């Protein structure tokens, strides 16, 4: 497997590590999303310990408004984080 393929698989595995805890095995509820963000992206996403911030992120990601974040919706967060990281790298 290439380095990129390995990282892609890692993103999928991290999602599944949190999505299988409660409810549907392939979606994140608000609590699971908060746990994933605070444990896996603590330096990347600021102010994620306060509930209003988590509520806003969840609301933005839950495109179909079903009360859960699917993998497809989670990829939007990953994409935003990658774009920001890319911009930040060029600032250094």
Swiss-Prot record:
Amino-acid positions noted as binding Ca(2+) 1 in the UniProt annotation, renumbered to this chain: 19, 24, 27, 32
Binding site for Cu cation: 16, 26, 86, 90
InterPro entries (UniProt xref): EF-hand-dom_pair, EF_Hand_1_Ca_BS, EF_hand_dom, S100/CaBP7/8-like_CS, S100_Ca-bd_sub
SMART domains listed in its UniProt record: EFh, S_100
Region (Hinge domain): 38-53
Domain notes: The hinge domain contributes significantly to its chemotactic properties.
Official protein name in the record: Protein S100-A12
Source organism (scientific name): Bos taurus (Bovine)
Species classification: Eukaryota, Metazoa, Chordata, Craniata, Vertebrata
